[in-house]
Amino acid sequence: MQPIISFEQFNFQYKHAAQPTVKDVTFHIYPGEKVLIAGRSGSGKSTLAHCMNGLIPFSYEGTSTGTILIDGKDPRKGSIFEQSKQVGTILQDQDAQFIGLTVEEDVAFYLENECVNEDDMKKIVSESLKKVKMHNFHKQSPHELSGGQKQTVSLAGLLTTNAHILLFDEPLANLDPVSSLHTVELIKDIHKQYNKTIVIIEHRIEEMLNLDLDKIILIDEGEIVAIGTPEKILASNILPSIGLREPMYIEGLKRLHFDSNNDVIYPLENLQRESVSGVINEWMEKQTFCKDTPTKKELLKVENLSFSYPNKQKVLDNVNFSLFKGEIVALLGHNGAGKSTLAHSLIGINKTKNDRILIDGVNINSWSIRKRGEVISYVMQNPNHMITQATVMEEISFSLKLKKFSKEEIKVRAEETLKICDLYPFRNWPIQALSYGQKKRLTIASVLTTNPKLIILDEPTAGQDYYHYKQFMTFIRKLAAKGLSFIFITHDMNLALEYADRAIVLKEGEVIANNTASIVLGHPETLKRANLKESSLFKLVKFSGIANPERFMELYFDDIRREEGV
C-alpha cells in the first residue's frame, strides 16, 4: 500500500528565519490511519500541518528541500484551493473557523464556492449535520454554541468537502472533559464510517489515547525523535525528555517504583492487578500524612451569593465560600454550572444585591468594576478577547501606562514578568506572530504586572504544552507563597489535583463540594453529579482494588507537595 502522506528528508525554513523550523523529516502515513503528531510549542508540529494543507508555501513563505507527497502529489506544485480538496483542516481557535452567520450557512460555505445548486446544497448540509448529530442546531448562530459544539460544526463543514485527510490542530485545546470525550468519540465514529485518514496535532498525549491511535510521531526542535505505536512510545521514557506529559497513572507508577516486568504499561487494563495493588499498599505503609497547615488570613468571603439573568432561572443559588491569602482554589463544574457567572459577579460585571462579597473584611458590593479591578484581576480563557495592542511589549505595558507608572518602572516590571513567563525573547514581536499558547501567557503576564491581591484565571493552562504548563504553575506557586491568591476556572483535573489547595465544585449554580482537590476528585458521586472526569491515576488506584483509594490520593499529592516544599 502506498502512503497517503509522505515526507522524505524534508526541510523548511520560514522567510527571514535564521534556521530551518523542520529538519530532515521523514515519515509516512497510510490511508485510513489515525496518527498523532506531538511536540511541545515551537517543536515544528504546526509547520508540518501547514505543509500538508497548503498554507506552506501559499500563505507562509519560505524555502523547502526534500520530498513531500500528499496522495501522490507534491502540494507545493498545485494551489491551496486544490490542496483543500485533499486535506480538510479544523483549527485550534474555533471562533476563527466560522464564516457564516448560522450553523447551516457555515457548513454550506465550501459548497457555495463550488457553485453547487441550492437543492443539492441543502441536502448535503442536512446530511453532514446529521452525521455529527447537530441537525437540530442548523439555525443557530455559531456564537451561541459551546466549544464542543463549535468543534462539531467545523467537522460537519469538512465532511461536505469529501477530503480524504482530516487534519485537526489541537482539537481539545478549549474543551471541557465531557466535550473532549465527545470530540474524540466523534472523530472515531467518522473514521469508522468513512475510513478517513486522521492526523492530529496535539501535545495532550493522554486525552488522545482514547482515539485508539495507530501510531504517534514525536517531534522536537524540528526533528522527528520517535515513531511508534502508543504501547511502544509509552513504554519508553522519551515523553518527559522532550517536554511532553505522560499519562498521570504512568507518572504515578514510576513514582511508586513499579516494575512493569515485560514493559506492559499501556493500556492500564493490561497491568497485573496484584503487582499494582502490592506496590501501592507498600508505598502507603511508608507514608505519613501532614494535616497541620499554617494559619492563613482570610482574603475573600462570599456570603449568600445568588444571581439570575433577566427572565431566566437562577444561575447562582446561595453560594458561600472563603478564600485565604496565598491560597490556590480550583473552581470546577460542567459547562453552564455557573463558574463564569460567579467570576463575573466577583469582578463586578454581574450586579448582585442581597449578598456580601468581602475583601479583607470590606464589603465591595458598591465598588465599581474599575475599583474592584485594582484588587481582583480576571484573565479570560480566549486570549484574543483580551489583547488590544500591536506588539508584546506594548500589550504588557498597557495597564501600567494607564496607572501612570514611570517609563523606567514600566520597563523593569514588563521585562521581569516577560522573563518569568518565558516571553522575553518575543518582546518586540507583533501579536499576530505568537502562537495561541504564547498569547495565553501574555494575557496572564499583563495582569501580573499590576500586583492584584486575587487573580481569577479561566482555563489558565489551555493551549499550553507541558513544559510551559509546569513552568507557569511553578511561577504561580511562588506568587501564592508570597500571599497572592488564585481562583482557577478549569476542566483540567490534573491541574486541580497537582496545584490547587482546595477544589470548589458547582452544579446548577450550587456548591456541591468544597474540600481538598484529592478528596473532591476522588469521590465518585461528586464526579458523576458534576460531569467531571476521573483522573487516570484514580482509575489505576480503583483498578488495583485497594481498600481506600481516596486515602491514597490524599497521601500521594501530599507527598508531592512536601517534596516541592509547599
Swiss-Prot record:
It is found in: Cell membrane. Keywords: ATP-binding, Cell membrane, Membrane, Nucleotide-binding, Repeat, Translocase, Transport. It is an enzyme of class 7 (translocase). It is a peripheral membrane protein. GO terms for molecular function: ATP binding; ATP hydrolysis activity; ATPase-coupled transmembrane transporter activity. InterPro entries: AAA+_ATPase (IPR003593), ABC_Co_transporter (IPR022216), ABC_transporter-like_ATP-bd (IPR003439), ABC_transporter-like_CS (IPR017871), ABC_transpr_CbiO/EcfA_su (IPR015856), ECF_ABC_transporter_ATP-bd (IPR050095), P-loop_NTPase (IPR027417). GO terms for cellular component: ATP-binding cassette (ABC) transporter complex. Pfam families: ABC_tran, DUF3744. Probably part of an ABC transporter complex. Responsible for energy coupling to the transport system. Belongs to the ABC transporter superfamily. This is Putative ABC transporter ATP-binding protein BCE_2668.
